[in-house]
Amino acid sequence: MGAFLAVLAEVFDLASITGLSVESILSGEALTTAELLQSHINNLVVYGGLTEAEALAAVEVTPQAFAALTSLFPNFPQALGALAATEFTATGALTVGAAVSAALYPYYWDYRTPVADLNMALQIWYPDLDILFPGALPFARFVNYIDPANWAADLYRAVGRYFWERVQAAGINFIEQQMETGRELAMRSVTSLSETLSQYFENARWAVSGLSTSLYHGLESYYSQLGLSPIQQRQLARNLGHPQPYRYDLYDAPQLKGQVSATYVTKVDPPGGANQRSAPDWMLPLLLGLYGDLTPSWKDTLEELEAEEDGSHSQKAKRRKTKA
């Protein structure tokens, strides 16, 4: 076994010196490489007029690697295989012989052969201390952890490490709890805000108004019912030959008729008499959106708006690229 390991060690040394792999050396490819390299060096020396050192420098091969390659003999793989086979055969024969001899060894129940020769103890057995003295092993382990010569520093280090581990674990747990509490608080805040807004919109008094139409009608009514100014009234009375009106009476303008600016939506009580929450159909998309649910029509509308925005952004990006 030692000879085989020595040969393997030499193979690894050759691989490290020559730069070839162990597989190429064991398979015999390194022999071909060595022969080709040696013939090339000889050609450079004979026909090129170079020395051996210059030829090795020209092919970038160190003298140590060249010497290691030339030291390989042609039947090296076969010799290594024969050595391995011989080693395996010898080891197998010894193992089989030892097993057979151990199986055929005469053993009698009357203990003619001493028990000490058959069962040799590698070390003296001692009973566990915890059986006789409970708590002795933890105390001994604690004493081994603390150096008697530097017991104060070791104790301070052990207590500090334990305190730091506990503080670190408590800090991690506290941070996780705070993050979970913040998440729950944010969800509660969003839920309460949505609930408040939805109830506000449900209980609000809604009115339908056409702002542009009512504005023009209001202006028309105002100018059509607007009276004459005091100067115009005195001029008109003077032209008609009527007595001029008293100046304080000029400001008694007729009251304009009230204009209706909007129409209130009639609020219907919940059907069934259970006083459950109810809302008109036109308000459902708003309330469902506050609670996070979207109707199919409103979802399609949002998708169309997002597609338009994405298209406008892509067109702007293309314009920037073309300008650049």
UniProtKB/Swiss-Prot annotation:
A motif (Nuclear localization signal) lies at residues 311-321. One of its GO terms (biological process) is symbiont entry into host cell. Pfam families: Polyoma_coat2. One of its GO terms (molecular function) is structural molecule activity. GO terms for cellular component: host cell; host cell endoplasmic reticulum membrane; host cell nucleus; membrane; viral capsid. InterPro entries: Polyoma_coat_VP2 (IPR001070). Residues 301-324 are annotated as: DNA-binding. The keyword DNA-binding applies. The keyword Transcription regulation does not apply. Residues 302-324 are annotated as: Disordered. It comes from the Viruses. This is Minor capsid protein VP2. It comes from Murine polyomavirus (strain Kilham) (MPyV).
